[in-house]
Design a protein with these regions (language model features):
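HIT superfamily nucleotide-processing domains
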Residues: 1-111
Length: 111
């Protein structure tokens, strides 16, 4: 989708600070971090939100997040994975993406 920000990042039209890439998934640093370490993981196949993804795409994403967090010292102290869905869920970019936050003590939801 030519008007999709994340599709343009995947295509190399917009630069990103890549931290992970395989055949199906791209991970990069969030431009506006909400934690000491804040990354976005996206599937290279466009979908609007998590409800449009099939089980293979979900497995691809979570396998990538698992590999990344295990290899980058996030697993031991903990991290959070979040996906916002649609307007009321806080989604602002309509290409399914998962936020991976860590590197510090995170606040509890609702705090």
């Amino acid at each position: 989708m030519s008007d999709c920000l994340f599709c343009r990042i995947i295509a190399g039209e917009i630069p990103s600070a890549k931290v992970f890439e395989n055949d199906h998934v791209l991970g990069f640093k969030d431009l506006y971090p909400q934690a000491k370490e804040h990354y976005l993981f996206i599937h290279k196949s466009h979908s609007k939100n998590v409800n449009e993804m099939d089980s293979t795409q979900l497995s691809d994403i979570f396998s990538a997040i698992k590999e990344f967090t295990q290899n980058n010292d996030l697993e031991e102290n903990g991290f959070r994975v979040v996906s916002n869905v649609n307007k009321h869920g806080g989604q602002t970019v309509f290409h399914t993406h998962f936020h991976v936050l860590g590197g510090e003590q995170l606040k509890h939801f609702g705090s």
